[in-house]
């Protein structure tokens, strides 16, 4: 028999429900359902027990149209996400409903979004490098397969573009499965991402649909269901216009889908999965909104007192087990570019590699605007990467650090006061800085340049040639937005020829 209650109070997304008639309270984190007058189902999540018969819940949808006295049904379980091969290539919201205009996937399997982290004995500790084809990342802050990676940056420095390039590169290089959780970001970016994935073949809607899309149409009747099951990605969205409840839970919905692919279904081996979260700060921000609405005392800078607990509960689920792995890339918005803010600082503690995007580097026109001295990785050591890679990375860091120290002298006294050796360091460091830039596949329509994936061997060779002084004769501009060092040499020699009057 259903456990039925009634709404007693509505304050924005917070709804109080009384179960006085049934006398049975739903468990904490249970999903409750209310049906509006127009037939739409609103899902609530039980957060607090207020007394003998009352609970306080947070809504996963907007609450317009709800009134006191409406019937509320306890589902008896947490919010469920459909899983299985049928969710490949599909778009879902926080409660696992398809939002791509196609029918709900035919899968009997569902998993609760609140699940325990894997047991200690099941966790895998093997270390393997995940090469991305992006020079600055692969050389100085390499990613760990099955690790957690953070992309830190303020507004408008290129976090989402970098994430889209990583999805594109890794899907093509490793033919991996990706789950993308859009947490509190722009709806337009979600739309762009879906189109980008269809164009690149990461999501496969079939040839007929692709042709209609190229002609400017969006005819979902032309989607090939067989082709859809061969897609390499699943998308889950809770955008910035949605309720704080949805934004606080959508990352867990995406993670649940990734966990299913990682663990397998019991009959077959699990997979290596990529989980992209854009933006993990919005998860914290939504948690802060919910916490305040629930009446909890705020802690530092107004964040929720349970910030570290909520972050830890989610991050501990993102791990590699003996059956498969989840490698997560998380974009982290840094409020006012302050890395000591509690939200990014709490995220730092869980990461294996950090890629810091800098406004100062973006202002130089160097994209991706990765700060090579602020970014780090726990596997930057010779045992994992080998001596040649490690030594090259150290040489690059040393020359950039020395250049940074000399910048104050240059600003006050000018280049004339530097020693001959320091002048060489400055010019080589500037070439190194520019060689970190690279044209992206996903930015081809903005830059007009063909996207490049660069192997680690080509990257090491290029930076060694610059630091050894083999390319001192080439202009600095030759190293800007190129892939391999051969392209830089070709571009530089062409520039020199054009500069010499015939």
Swiss-Prot record:
InterPro entries linked: AAA+_ATPase, ATP-synt_VA_C, ATP_synth_F1_bsu, ATPase_a/bsu_AS, ATPase_alpha/beta_chains, ATPase_F1/V1/A1_a/bsu_N, ATPase_F1/V1/A1_a/bsu_N_sf, ATPase_F1/V1/A1_a/bsu_nucl-bd
Domain of life: Bacteria
CDD domains from the UniProt entry: ATP-synt_F1_beta_C, ATP-synt_F1_beta_N, F1-ATPase_beta_CD
GO molecular function per UniProt: ATP binding; ATP hydrolysis activity; proton-transporting ATP synthase activity, rotational mechanism
Keyword set, alphabetical order: ATP synthesis, ATP-binding, Cell membrane, CF(1), Hydrogen ion transport, Ion transport, Membrane, Nucleotide-binding, Translocase, Transport
Catalytic activity: ATP + H2O + 4 H(+)(in) = ADP + phosphate + 5 H(+)(out)
Membrane topology: Peripheral membrane protein
Compartments, record wording: Cell membrane
Pfam families linked to this entry: ATP-synt_ab, ATP-synt_ab_N, ATP-synt_VA_C
EC code(s) of this entry: 7.1.2.2
Broad EC category: translocase
Residues bound to ATP: 153-160
Main location: membrane
GO cellular component: plasma membrane; proton-transporting ATP synthase complex
Subunit: F-type ATPases have 2 components, CF(1) - the catalytic core - and CF(0) - the membrane proton channel. CF(1) has five subunits: alpha(3), beta(3), gamma(1), delta(1), epsilon(1). CF(0) has three main subunits: a(1), b(2) and c(9-12). The alpha and beta chains form an alternating ring which encloses part of the gamma chain. CF(1) is attached to CF(0) by a central stalk formed by the gamma and epsilon chains, while a peripheral stalk is formed by the delta and b chains.
Stated family: Belongs to the ATPase alpha/beta chains family.
Function summary: Produces ATP from ADP in the presence of a proton gradient across the membrane. The catalytic sites are hosted primarily by the beta subunits.
Name listed for the protein in its UniProt record: ATP synthase subunit beta
Annotated organism of origin: Amoebophilus asiaticus (strain 5a2)
Gene name per UniProt: atpD
């Amino acid at each position: 028999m259903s456990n039925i209650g009634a709404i007693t109070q509505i304050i924005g997304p917070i709804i109080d429900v009384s179960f006085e008639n049934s006398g049975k309270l739903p468990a904490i984190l249970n999903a409750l359902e209310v049906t509006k007058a127009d037939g739409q189902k609103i899902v609530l999540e039980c957060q607090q027990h207020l007394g003998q018969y009352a609970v306080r819940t947070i809504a996963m949808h907007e609450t317009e149209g709800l009134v006191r006295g409406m019937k509320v049904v306890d589902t008896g379980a947490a919010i469920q996400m459909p899983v299985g091969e049928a969710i490949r290539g599909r778009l879902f919201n926080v409660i696992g409903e398809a939002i791509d205009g196609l029918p709900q996937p035919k899968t009997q399997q569902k998993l609760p979004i609140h699940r325990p982290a894997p047991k200690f004995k099941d966790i895998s500790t093997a270390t393997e490098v995940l090469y991305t084809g992006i020079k600055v990342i692969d050389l100085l802050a390499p990613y760990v397969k099955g690790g957690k990676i953070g992309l830190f940056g303020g507004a408008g420095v290129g976090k989402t573009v970098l994430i889209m390039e990583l999805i594109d590169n890794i899907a093509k290089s490793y033919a991996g499965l990706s789950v993308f959780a859009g947490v509190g970001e722009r709806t337009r970016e979600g739309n762009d991402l879906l189109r980008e994935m269809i164009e690149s073949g990461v999501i496969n809607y079939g040839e007929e649909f692709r042709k209609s899309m190229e002609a400017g149409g969006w005819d979902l009747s032309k989607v090939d269901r067989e082709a859809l099951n061969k897609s390499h990605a699943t998308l889950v969205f809770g955008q910035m216009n949605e309720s704080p409840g949805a934004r606080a839970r959508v990352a867990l919905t995406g993670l649940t889908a990734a966990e299913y692919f990682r663990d397998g279904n019991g009959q077959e081996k699990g997979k290596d999965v990529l989980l992209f979260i854009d933006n993990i700060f919005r998860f914290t921000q939504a948690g802060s909104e919910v916490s305040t609405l629930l009446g909890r005392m705020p802690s530092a800078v107004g964040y929720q007192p349970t910030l570290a607990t909520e972050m830890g509960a989610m991050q501990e689920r993102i791990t590699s087990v003996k059956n498969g792995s989840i490698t997560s890339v998380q974009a982290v918005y840094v409020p006012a570019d302050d890395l000591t803010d509690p939200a990014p600082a709490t995220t730092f503690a869980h990461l294996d590699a950090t890629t810091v995007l800098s406004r100062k580097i973006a202002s130089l026109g160097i994209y991706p605007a990765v700060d090579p001295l602020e970014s780090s990785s726990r596997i930057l050591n010779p045992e994992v990467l080998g001596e040649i890679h490690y030594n090259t990375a150290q040489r690059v860091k040393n020359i950039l650090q020395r250049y940074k120290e000399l910048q104050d002298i240059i600003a006050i006294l000018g280049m004339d006061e530097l020693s001959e050796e320091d002048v060489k360091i400055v010019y080589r460091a500037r070439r190194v800085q520019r060689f970190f830039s690279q044209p992206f596949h996903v930015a081809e329509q903005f830059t007009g340049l063909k996207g490049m994936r660069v192997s680690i061997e080509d990257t090491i060779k290029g930076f060694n040639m610059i630091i050894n002084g083999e390319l001192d004769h080439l202009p600095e501009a030759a190293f800007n937005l190129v892939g391999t060092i051969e392209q830089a040499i070709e571009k530089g020699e062409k520039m020199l020829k054009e500069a010499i009057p015939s």
